């Protein structure tokens, strides 16, 4: 009996130490696309009609924003091969001053998409428990590798955007990989997606209107406390992406 209680205590302790998620995370139900949308920065495909818009409304860094300076929203659809995002932004000034895609990419205007394939939460700073794709205006996608250095993961994605005055339409598609992904091999294969699958998911935007560093960081999830810029480290901040028919 004492041995049983000891095992129970160990199990309870293990559960309490498992990585989790912050309270009050959002859930986005993404409908399956009968035909995949074209990733062309237009956003007029039928695949988008059933997907709901979700705002980027949580200011993680920077002072109060005027609506003329920035507005953002997104929607998501999927096929068994990958997920697709359609994003619409109002941004009066676009900045891309760091020509080396691996240098200070977060201080330019940058779209960020965070994905935790198995919805496990937890740390992903220097591992692939989750991916934090930083999409630059040149459509490259950067994250930090297991060697603790920025790497291009542009081969995981397709990205296109178009601008009309201050309005930007941005479309991306993303292959989904497990946390077994290895940077040192070329045999990684994306998972096959299915209705009912849950993933950790979050969208954010770095806005720079001409400063040396980004002036605002706006996300799709509420971040409590003083350290709001932690999505690149902690997948517990992510919301939930639920794939539905």
Task: Report residues per predicted region.
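Hydrophobic h-region of N-terminal signal peptides that target proteins for export
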Residues: 4-15
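Structural preference for beta-rich elements and adjacent junctions enriched in aromatics
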Residues: 14-245
């Amino acid at each position: 009996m004492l041995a049983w209680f000891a095992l129970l205590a160990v199990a309870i302790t293990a559960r309490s130490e498992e990585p989790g998620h912050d309270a009050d995370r959002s859930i986005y139900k993404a409908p399956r696309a009968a035909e995949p949308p074209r990733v062309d920065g237009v956003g007029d495909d039928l695949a988008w009609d059933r997907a709901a818009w979700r705002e980027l409304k949580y200011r993680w860094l920077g002072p109060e924003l005027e609506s003329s300076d920035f507005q953002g929203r997104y929607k998501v659809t999927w096929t068994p091969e990958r997920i697709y995002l359609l994003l619409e932004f109002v941004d009066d000034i676009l900045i891309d001053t760091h020509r080396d895609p691996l240098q200070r990419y977060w201080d330019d205007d940058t779209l960020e998409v965070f994905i935790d394939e198995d919805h496990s939460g937890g740390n992903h700073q220097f591992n692939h428990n989750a991916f934090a794709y930083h999409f630059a205006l040149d459509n490259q996608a950067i994250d930090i590798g297991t060697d603790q250095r920025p790497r291009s993961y542009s081969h995981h994605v397709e990205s296109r955007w178009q601008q009309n005055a201050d309005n930007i339409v941005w479309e991306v598609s993303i292959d989904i990989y497990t946390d077994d992904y290895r940077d040192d091999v070329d045999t990684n294969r994306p998972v096959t997606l299915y209705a009912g699958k849950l993933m950790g998911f979050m969208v954010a935007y770095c806005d720079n209107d001409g400063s040396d560093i980004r002036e605002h960081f706006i996300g799709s999830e509420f971040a409590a406390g003083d350290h709001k810029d932690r999505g690149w480290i902690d997948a517990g901040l992510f919301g939930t992406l639920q794939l539905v028919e």
